[in-house]
């Protein structure tokens, strides 16, 4: 996978993950082109399209479009399944995810994506393991944010 974009029906970019090095200018150009292309397509049209030298795979869930660019030899159906698995993980974590969850908790959405995909390849296939890792990270964050006394810090209590 070269990149993943999440954008709204209004064309607002909500999440972007790039797995290939590109300049900011090129990223903006790609994003603008793809958002326009995908939003212009009718709902009954195929979720795969050829674009430049890549294949674009996208799926709409509620008000969000999940859009991935893959290389010519990659499997479109597996990519659709990757998108679906990511949505399932977001649903499990947020409890029926919506666009606002991603807007206000974008760092969690990125963290979930990073636990699931590494370098554009699936890192962990088990939803349970991904969610367990996220739970552990949440616990660590809560621990770090909990105020402790000086005596606790140096281990005297």
From Swiss-Prot:
It holds the Pfam family Clat_adaptor_s. Subunit of clathrin-associated adaptor protein complex 1 that plays a role in protein sorting in the late-Golgi/trans-Golgi network (TGN) and/or endosomes. The AP complexes mediate both the recruitment of clathrin to membranes and the recognition of sorting signals within the cytosolic tails of transmembrane cargo molecules. GO terms for biological process: intracellular protein transport; melanosome assembly; platelet dense granule organization; vesicle-mediated transport. This is AP-1 complex subunit sigma-2. Widely expressed. Adaptor protein complex 1 (AP-1) is a heterotetramer composed of two large adaptins (gamma-type subunit AP1G1 and beta-type subunit AP1B1), a medium adaptin (mu-type subunit AP1M1 or AP1M2) and a small adaptin (sigma-type subunit AP1S1 or AP1S2 or AP1S3). Binds to MUC1. The lineage of its organism: Eukaryota, Metazoa, Chordata, Craniata, Vertebrata. One of its GO terms (cellular component) is cytosol. InterPro entries: AP1_sigma (IPR044733), AP_complex_ssu (IPR016635), AP_mu_sigma_su (IPR022775), Clathrin_sm-chain_CS (IPR000804), Longin-like_dom_sf (IPR011012). It is linked to Pettigrew syndrome: An X-linked syndrome characterized by intellectual disability and additional highly variable features, including choreoathetosis, hydrocephalus, Dandy-Walker malformation, seizures, and iron or calcium deposition in the brain. Intellectual disability is characterized by significantly below average general intellectual functioning associated with impairments in adaptive behavior and manifested during the developmental period. It is a peripheral membrane protein. It is found in: Golgi apparatus; Cytoplasmic vesicle membrane; Membrane, Clathrin-coated pit. Keywords: Coated pit, Cytoplasmic vesicle, Golgi apparatus, Intellectual disability, Membrane, Protein transport, Transport. GO terms for molecular function: clathrin adaptor activity. Belongs to the adaptor complexes small subunit family. It comes from Homo sapiens.
């Amino acid at each position: 996978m070269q990149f993943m974009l999440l954008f709204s029906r209004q064309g607002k970019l909500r999440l972007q993950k790039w797995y290939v090095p590109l300049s900011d200018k090129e990223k903006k150009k790609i994003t603008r082109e793809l958002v326009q292309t995908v939003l212009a397509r009718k709902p009954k049209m195929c979720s795969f399209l050829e674009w430049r030298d890549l294949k674009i795979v996208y799926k709409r869930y509620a008000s969000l479009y999940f859009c991935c660019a893959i290389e010519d030899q990659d499997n479109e159906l597996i990519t659709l399944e990757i998108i679906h698995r990511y949505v399932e993980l977001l649903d499990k974590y947020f409890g029926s995810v919506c666009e606002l969850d991603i807007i206000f908790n974008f760092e969690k959405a990125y963290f979930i994506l990073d636990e699931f995909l590494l370098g554009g390849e699936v890192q962990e296939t088990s939803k349970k393991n991904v969610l367990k890792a996220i739970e552990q990270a949440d616990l660590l964050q809560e621990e770090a944010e909990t105020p402790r006394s000086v005596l606790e810090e140096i281990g005297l209590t």
